[in-house]
Amino acid sequence: MKRIGILTSGGDAAGMNAAVRAIARSAMNAGLEAYGINYGYKGLVEGNIFKMESTKLDEIINRGGTILYSARFPEFAETETQLKGIEQLKKFGIEALVVIGGDGSYHGAEKLTMHGYNSIGVPGTIDNDIPGTDFTIGFDTAANVAMEALDRINDTATSHQRVFVVEVMGRGAGDIALWSGIATGADAIVIPEREYDIEAIANKISENRKNGKDHGLIVLAEGVMGAAEFKEKLDQYGDFDSRAITLGHIQRGGNPTVKDRVLATRLGDYAIRLLLEGKGGLAIGIHDNQLVATDIIDTLENHKHQTDVSLQDLNDRVRF
Protein backbone atom coordinates (compact mmCIF):
# COMPACT_ATOMS: atom_id res chain seq x y z
CA MET A 1 0.00 0.00 0.00
CA LYS A 2 1.33 3.41 -1.01
CA ARG A 3 -1.56 5.87 -0.76
CA ILE A 4 -4.45 6.41 1.64
CA GLY A 5 -7.37 8.83 1.43
CA ILE A 6 -9.05 10.83 4.19
CA LEU A 7 -12.48 12.41 4.20
CA THR A 8 -14.80 14.00 6.75
CA SER A 9 -18.53 13.69 6.30
CA GLY A 10 -21.79 14.71 7.94
CA GLY A 11 -22.03 17.25 10.74
CA ASP A 12 -18.74 18.81 11.78
CA ALA A 13 -17.36 17.97 15.21
CA ALA A 14 -14.52 19.57 17.15
CA GLY A 15 -11.51 17.26 16.95
CA MET A 16 -12.00 16.23 13.34
CA ASN A 17 -8.93 18.26 12.37
CA ALA A 18 -6.89 16.55 15.05
CA ALA A 19 -7.94 13.20 13.55
CA VAL A 20 -7.08 14.35 10.02
CA ARG A 21 -3.65 15.45 11.26
CA ALA A 22 -3.00 12.16 13.05
CA ILE A 23 -4.08 10.02 10.10
CA ALA A 24 -2.04 11.99 7.57
CA ARG A 25 1.07 12.34 9.72
CA SER A 26 1.06 8.68 10.81
CA ALA A 27 0.70 7.64 7.17
CA MET A 28 3.48 9.95 5.99
CA ASN A 29 5.82 8.88 8.77
CA ALA A 30 5.23 5.28 7.69
CA GLY A 31 6.24 6.09 4.13
CA LEU A 32 2.74 6.43 2.69
CA GLU A 33 1.20 9.30 0.77
CA ALA A 34 -1.93 10.86 2.24
CA TYR A 35 -4.64 12.35 0.05
CA GLY A 36 -7.35 14.65 1.35
CA ILE A 37 -10.85 14.58 -0.10
CA ASN A 38 -12.81 17.83 0.16
CA TYR A 39 -16.56 17.94 0.86
CA GLY A 40 -17.00 14.34 1.97
CA TYR A 41 -18.55 11.76 -0.34
CA LYS A 42 -19.70 14.52 -2.70
CA GLY A 43 -16.09 15.56 -3.23
CA LEU A 44 -15.07 11.93 -3.59
CA VAL A 45 -17.48 11.35 -6.47
CA GLU A 46 -16.49 14.66 -8.09
CA GLY A 47 -12.76 13.92 -7.77
CA ASN A 48 -12.04 16.83 -5.40
CA ILE A 49 -8.90 15.09 -4.18
CA PHE A 50 -5.43 16.46 -3.41
CA LYS A 51 -2.11 15.30 -2.02
CA MET A 52 -1.60 16.47 1.55
CA GLU A 53 1.58 18.14 2.77
CA SER A 54 2.92 17.66 6.29
CA THR A 55 3.75 21.36 6.69
CA LYS A 56 0.08 22.27 6.18
CA LEU A 57 -0.92 20.15 9.17
CA ASP A 58 1.04 22.04 11.83
CA GLU A 59 -1.65 24.42 13.05
CA ILE A 60 -4.86 22.42 12.82
CA ILE A 61 -4.91 20.27 15.96
CA ASN A 62 -6.49 23.12 17.93
CA ARG A 63 -9.04 24.18 15.31
CA GLY A 64 -12.72 23.33 15.28
CA GLY A 65 -14.60 22.29 12.17
CA THR A 66 -12.79 20.40 9.42
CA ILE A 67 -10.19 21.64 6.95
CA LEU A 68 -11.49 19.02 4.51
CA TYR A 69 -14.96 20.56 4.69
CA SER A 70 -18.12 18.50 4.77
CA ALA A 71 -21.32 18.12 2.78
CA ARG A 72 -24.52 16.15 2.98
CA PHE A 73 -24.72 13.79 0.01
CA PRO A 74 -27.70 11.40 0.21
CA GLU A 75 -27.01 10.31 -3.38
CA PHE A 76 -24.17 8.16 -2.04
CA ALA A 77 -26.79 5.65 -0.92
CA GLU A 78 -27.12 4.67 -4.60
CA THR A 79 -24.92 1.84 -5.87
CA GLU A 80 -24.03 3.67 -9.09
CA THR A 81 -22.78 6.67 -7.11
CA GLN A 82 -20.74 4.46 -4.79
CA LEU A 83 -19.02 2.85 -7.76
CA LYS A 84 -18.21 6.29 -9.16
CA GLY A 85 -16.51 7.08 -5.86
CA ILE A 86 -14.43 3.92 -6.08
CA GLU A 87 -13.46 4.82 -9.65
CA GLN A 88 -12.12 8.16 -8.41
CA LEU A 89 -10.13 6.48 -5.65
CA LYS A 90 -8.57 4.08 -8.14
CA LYS A 91 -7.87 6.95 -10.54
CA PHE A 92 -5.75 8.62 -7.86
CA GLY A 93 -4.13 5.33 -6.83
CA ILE A 94 -5.68 5.46 -3.35
CA GLU A 95 -5.78 1.97 -1.90
CA ALA A 96 -7.62 2.58 1.37
CA LEU A 97 -9.99 5.24 2.69
CA VAL A 98 -10.33 6.54 6.25
CA VAL A 99 -13.74 8.12 6.89
CA ILE A 100 -14.29 10.44 9.85
CA GLY A 101 -17.93 11.04 10.67
CA GLY A 102 -21.16 9.82 12.17
CA ASP A 103 -23.88 7.34 11.30
CA GLY A 104 -24.37 8.36 7.67
CA SER A 105 -20.63 8.52 7.08
CA TYR A 106 -20.22 5.03 8.50
CA HIS A 107 -22.90 3.67 6.19
CA GLY A 108 -20.97 5.13 3.26
CA ALA A 109 -17.82 3.35 4.40
CA GLU A 110 -19.87 0.19 4.89
CA LYS A 111 -21.07 0.32 1.28
CA LEU A 112 -17.51 0.77 0.00
CA THR A 113 -16.48 -2.24 2.08
CA MET A 114 -19.30 -4.29 0.57
CA HIS A 115 -17.93 -3.41 -2.88
CA GLY A 116 -14.54 -4.78 -1.82
CA TYR A 117 -12.87 -1.43 -1.20
CA ASN A 118 -10.81 -1.12 1.98
CA SER A 119 -12.32 1.45 4.35
CA ILE A 120 -12.05 2.30 8.04
CA GLY A 121 -14.58 4.37 9.99
CA VAL A 122 -13.40 6.82 12.67
CA PRO A 123 -16.23 8.04 14.95
CA GLY A 124 -16.60 11.82 14.62
CA THR A 125 -19.91 13.30 15.79
CA ILE A 126 -21.05 15.41 18.72
CA ASP A 127 -24.04 13.10 19.21
CA ASN A 128 -22.00 10.21 20.66
CA ASP A 129 -24.40 7.79 18.98
CA ILE A 130 -22.05 5.50 17.06
CA PRO A 131 -21.97 1.78 17.98
CA GLY A 132 -18.61 0.22 18.71
CA THR A 133 -17.19 3.04 20.84
CA ASP A 134 -17.81 4.55 24.26
CA PHE A 135 -17.10 8.07 23.02
CA THR A 136 -16.98 9.84 19.67
CA ILE A 137 -14.71 12.68 18.60
CA GLY A 138 -16.49 15.97 19.30
CA PHE A 139 -18.79 14.79 22.06
CA ASP A 140 -16.68 16.03 24.95
CA THR A 141 -16.30 19.47 23.39
CA ALA A 142 -20.03 19.73 22.68
CA ALA A 143 -20.91 18.64 26.21
CA ASN A 144 -18.52 21.22 27.63
CA VAL A 145 -19.96 23.98 25.43
CA ALA A 146 -23.46 23.01 26.55
CA MET A 147 -22.32 22.96 30.18
CA GLU A 148 -20.86 26.46 29.96
CA ALA A 149 -24.03 27.79 28.32
CA LEU A 150 -26.23 26.11 30.93
CA ASP A 151 -24.14 27.64 33.73
CA ARG A 152 -24.75 31.09 32.26
CA ILE A 153 -28.45 30.45 31.79
CA ASN A 154 -28.69 29.19 35.36
CA ASP A 155 -27.25 32.50 36.58
CA THR A 156 -30.10 34.33 34.86
CA ALA A 157 -32.66 31.80 36.08
CA THR A 158 -31.50 32.41 39.64
CA SER A 159 -31.52 36.19 39.27
CA HIS A 160 -35.05 36.33 37.85
CA GLN A 161 -36.63 33.30 39.57
CA ARG A 162 -37.38 31.70 36.22
CA VAL A 163 -37.62 28.19 34.85
CA PHE A 164 -35.55 27.60 31.72
CA VAL A 165 -36.12 24.77 29.27
CA VAL A 166 -32.89 24.40 27.32
CA GLU A 167 -32.76 22.21 24.23
CA VAL A 168 -29.37 20.67 23.42
CA MET A 169 -28.24 18.70 20.40
CA GLY A 170 -27.74 14.95 20.10
CA ARG A 171 -30.03 13.87 17.28
CA GLY A 172 -31.74 10.73 18.62
CA ALA A 173 -29.35 10.29 21.55
CA GLY A 174 -29.51 11.89 24.98
CA ASP A 175 -25.81 11.85 25.84
CA ILE A 176 -25.16 15.60 25.59
CA ALA A 177 -28.26 16.31 27.67
CA LEU A 178 -27.27 13.75 30.31
CA TRP A 179 -23.68 14.81 30.75
CA SER A 180 -24.23 18.56 30.60
CA GLY A 181 -27.34 18.28 32.77
CA ILE A 182 -25.55 16.42 35.54
CA ALA A 183 -22.63 18.85 35.36
CA THR A 184 -24.93 21.85 35.87
CA GLY A 185 -27.25 20.48 38.53
CA ALA A 186 -30.33 20.35 36.31
CA ASP A 187 -33.70 19.86 37.98
CA ALA A 188 -34.72 17.52 35.17
CA ILE A 189 -33.01 15.87 32.20
CA VAL A 190 -35.32 14.68 29.44
CA ILE A 191 -33.93 12.19 26.92
CA PRO A 192 -35.35 10.01 24.11
CA GLU A 193 -34.12 6.79 25.69
CA ARG A 194 -36.53 7.03 28.62
CA GLU A 195 -40.17 7.83 29.15
CA TYR A 196 -40.86 11.14 30.83
CA ASP A 197 -43.78 12.76 32.65
CA ILE A 198 -44.08 16.51 32.11
CA GLU A 199 -46.67 16.83 34.87
CA ALA A 200 -44.31 15.13 37.33
CA ILE A 201 -41.50 17.49 36.30
CA ALA A 202 -43.81 20.49 36.81
CA ASN A 203 -44.85 19.17 40.22
CA LYS A 204 -41.21 18.75 41.21
CA ILE A 205 -40.40 22.36 40.28
CA SER A 206 -43.47 23.56 42.22
CA GLU A 207 -42.36 21.48 45.21
CA ASN A 208 -38.87 22.98 44.97
CA ARG A 209 -40.41 26.45 45.17
CA LYS A 210 -42.19 25.57 48.39
CA ASN A 211 -38.90 24.28 49.79
CA GLY A 212 -36.92 27.42 48.95
CA LYS A 213 -35.64 26.95 45.39
CA ASP A 214 -37.37 29.58 43.26
CA HIS A 215 -35.82 28.81 39.86
CA GLY A 216 -35.44 25.77 37.64
CA LEU A 217 -33.34 24.28 34.85
CA ILE A 218 -34.64 21.58 32.52
CA VAL A 219 -32.20 20.12 30.00
CA LEU A 220 -34.00 18.70 26.98
CA ALA A 221 -32.48 16.47 24.30
CA GLU A 222 -33.55 17.55 20.81
CA GLY A 223 -34.64 14.01 20.01
CA VAL A 224 -37.57 14.37 22.41
CA MET A 225 -39.17 17.58 21.12
CA GLY A 226 -38.36 21.26 20.73
CA ALA A 227 -37.86 23.54 23.73
CA ALA A 228 -40.80 25.79 22.82
CA GLU A 229 -43.19 22.85 22.61
CA PHE A 230 -41.95 21.41 25.90
CA LYS A 231 -42.31 24.81 27.64
CA GLU A 232 -45.87 25.13 26.37
CA LYS A 233 -46.78 21.74 27.81
CA LEU A 234 -44.97 22.46 31.08
CA ASP A 235 -46.87 25.72 31.57
CA GLN A 236 -50.15 23.79 31.55
CA TYR A 237 -49.25 22.29 34.92
CA GLY A 238 -48.06 25.33 36.83
CA ASP A 239 -47.82 29.10 37.04
CA PHE A 240 -44.20 29.33 35.89
CA ASP A 241 -42.24 32.30 34.59
CA SER A 242 -40.60 30.06 32.01
CA ARG A 243 -38.39 30.54 28.99
CA ALA A 244 -37.40 28.19 26.14
CA ILE A 245 -33.91 28.25 24.62
CA THR A 246 -32.33 26.20 21.84
CA LEU A 247 -28.53 26.15 22.00
CA GLY A 248 -28.14 25.03 18.39
CA HIS A 249 -24.96 24.91 16.35
CA ILE A 250 -22.78 26.62 18.95
CA GLN A 251 -22.28 23.09 20.29
CA ARG A 252 -20.46 21.97 17.16
CA GLY A 253 -17.78 24.62 16.77
CA GLY A 254 -14.86 25.98 18.75
CA ASN A 255 -11.53 24.65 19.89
CA PRO A 256 -11.66 20.96 20.85
CA THR A 257 -11.07 19.96 24.46
CA VAL A 258 -7.95 18.08 25.49
CA LYS A 259 -10.00 14.86 25.64
CA ASP A 260 -11.20 15.25 22.07
CA ARG A 261 -7.73 16.16 20.77
CA VAL A 262 -6.14 13.13 22.41
CA LEU A 263 -8.97 10.77 21.43
CA ALA A 264 -8.81 11.97 17.82
CA THR A 265 -5.04 11.55 17.74
CA ARG A 266 -5.21 8.04 19.18
CA LEU A 267 -7.92 6.92 16.77
CA GLY A 268 -6.27 8.51 13.73
CA ASP A 269 -2.96 6.80 14.41
CA TYR A 270 -4.74 3.52 15.16
CA ALA A 271 -6.48 3.59 11.77
CA ILE A 272 -3.13 3.75 9.98
CA ARG A 273 -1.58 1.02 12.13
CA LEU A 274 -4.48 -1.27 11.24
CA LEU A 275 -4.09 -0.52 7.53
CA LEU A 276 -0.37 -1.22 7.71
CA GLU A 277 -1.23 -4.60 9.22
CA GLY A 278 -3.37 -5.31 6.18
CA LYS A 279 -6.66 -4.88 8.01
CA GLY A 280 -9.71 -2.97 6.81
CA GLY A 281 -13.49 -2.92 6.67
CA LEU A 282 -13.45 -1.80 10.27
CA ALA A 283 -15.13 0.61 12.65
CA ILE A 284 -12.70 1.76 15.31
CA GLY A 285 -13.36 3.26 18.70
CA ILE A 286 -12.50 3.27 22.36
CA HIS A 287 -13.87 0.98 25.07
CA ASP A 288 -12.73 1.15 28.70
CA ASN A 289 -9.94 3.46 27.45
CA GLN A 290 -8.65 0.76 25.09
CA LEU A 291 -8.61 1.14 21.32
CA VAL A 292 -10.91 -1.37 19.63
CA ALA A 293 -11.74 -2.38 16.06
CA THR A 294 -14.87 -4.19 14.94
CA ASP A 295 -16.20 -5.31 11.57
CA ILE A 296 -17.99 -2.25 10.19
CA ILE A 297 -20.79 -4.22 8.53
CA ASP A 298 -21.54 -6.25 11.65
CA THR A 299 -21.27 -3.15 13.85
CA LEU A 300 -23.84 -1.20 11.86
CA GLU A 301 -26.19 -4.07 11.12
CA ASN A 302 -26.28 -5.78 14.52
CA HIS A 303 -25.39 -3.24 17.19
CA LYS A 304 -26.72 0.04 18.58
CA HIS A 305 -25.13 2.73 20.70
CA GLN A 306 -26.21 2.35 24.31
CA THR A 307 -26.73 5.61 26.19
CA ASP A 308 -25.92 5.21 29.88
CA VAL A 309 -29.40 6.01 31.19
CA SER A 310 -28.24 5.27 34.76
CA LEU A 311 -26.80 8.79 34.67
CA GLN A 312 -30.36 10.09 34.79
CA ASP A 313 -30.92 8.10 37.98
CA LEU A 314 -27.74 9.63 39.37
CA ASN A 315 -29.04 13.12 38.66
CA ASP A 316 -32.35 12.32 40.34
CA ARG A 317 -30.53 11.20 43.49
CA VAL A 318 -28.38 14.32 43.83
CA ARG A 319 -30.69 17.10 42.62
CA PHE A 320 -32.56 19.50 44.94
Swiss-Prot record:
Active site as annotated: D127 (proton acceptor)
Record-stated family: Belongs to the phosphofructokinase type A (PFKA) family. ATP-dependent PFK group I subfamily. Prokaryotic clade 'B1' sub-subfamily.
Residues that coordinate or bind ADP: R21, A22, I23, A24, R25, G185, A186, D187, K213, D214, H215
Amino-acid positions noted as binding Mg(2+) in the UniProt annotation, renumbered to this chain: D103
Function of the protein: Catalyzes the phosphorylation of D-fructose 6-phosphate to fructose 1,6-bisphosphate by ATP, the first committing step of glycolysis.
Reaction catalyzed: beta-D-fructose 6-phosphate + ATP = beta-D-fructose 1,6-bisphosphate + ADP + H(+)
Protein known as: ATP-dependent 6-phosphofructokinase
Positions of ATP binding: G11, R72, F73, G102, D103, G104, S105
Cofactor(s) recorded in Swiss-Prot or TrEMBL: Mg(2+)
Any matching Pfam family: PFK
Keyword Kinase in record: yes
Principal localisation: cytoplasm
Regulation: Allosterically activated by ADP and other diphosphonucleosides, and allosterically inhibited by phosphoenolpyruvate.
Compartments where located: Cytoplasm
Organism: Ligilactobacillus salivarius (strain UCC118) (Lactobacillus salivarius)
Chain positions recorded as substrate binding sites: T125, I126, D127, R162, M169, G170, R171, E222, R243, H249, I250, Q251, R252
Molecular function terms from GO: 6-phosphofructokinase activity; AMP binding; ATP binding; fructose-6-phosphate binding; identical protein binding; metal ion binding; monosaccharide binding
EC number: 2.7.1.11
Gene Ontology CC entries for this record: 6-phosphofructokinase complex
Gene (UniProt): pfkA
Subunit (UniProt): Homotetramer.
Keyword ATP-binding listed: yes
